[in-house]
Regions:
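N-terminal signal peptide c-region/cleavage motif recognized by signal peptidases
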Residues: 10-12
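Catalytic glycan-binding domains that act on GlcNAc-containing polysaccharides
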Residues: 14-174
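Bacterial N-terminal signal peptides
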Residues: 1-8
Length: 174
């Protein structure tokens, strides 16, 4: 699903009040001093999926994205098996809610399968985001954009898309 489609689906007309209390986004947000809605917004843009064919989209924990295609595993067990098969060929794979890239961030974990644990995945995503904010303390869009890419033509576009999703969700967050 494209980022523009996610931004469209998370419009004022479609958004309803929601709470992140008790979620991994709430827990990690408190631990990392990051707004949980921002973490959720990044996860929504990174792994957003609509498994039930409704108008709702949500971060999905068992997404694996290779350079060729995204894989939406139905279960954690399936995701583990698919990830193991992918890693036999390449470490160019993004994993889980926050789409942590094994090639660039594999050093942060003992085993790539650890990234299928939602809490671990969001914690690593928060660490990456905090590192970006430390590099760009006065430019949130740049810091958020660098979460996804360091290619200048993609950074601002991604950062602005996440910021629009964040701003919309923040207005509806309890």
């Amino acid at each position: 699903m494209s980022l523009s489609m996610i931004a469209l689906m998370v419009s004022h007309e479609n958004a309803e009040a929601f709470s992140l209390k008790g979620t991994v986004f709430d827990q990690v947000g408190q631990e990392a001093n990051i707004d949980p809605v921002l973490l959720y917004s990044i996860a929504l843009c990174e792994s957003g999926f609509n498994p039930s064919s409704t108008k709702m989209v949500a971060p999905y924990p068992w997404v694996l994205r290779t350079p060729n295609k995204p894989i939406y595993a139905q279960t954690e067990k399936e995701a583990r098996a698919r990830l193991s098969a992918i890693l036999k060929k390449s470490n160019a794979v993004d994993v889980g809610l926050m789409q942590i890239n094994v090639r660039w961030h594999g050093h942060r974990i003992k085993n790539a399968e650890d990234l299928l644990d939602p809490l671990t995945n969001v914690r690593i995503g928060a660490d990456i985001l905090n590192e970006n904010f430390a590099r760009h303390p006065h430019d949130a869009i740049q810091a958020i954009g660098n979460y996804h890419s360091f290619q200048s033509d993609r950074v601002r576009s991604y950062g602005l898309t996440v910021w629009r999703v964040f701003s919309t969700l923040k207005a509806w967050h309890d």
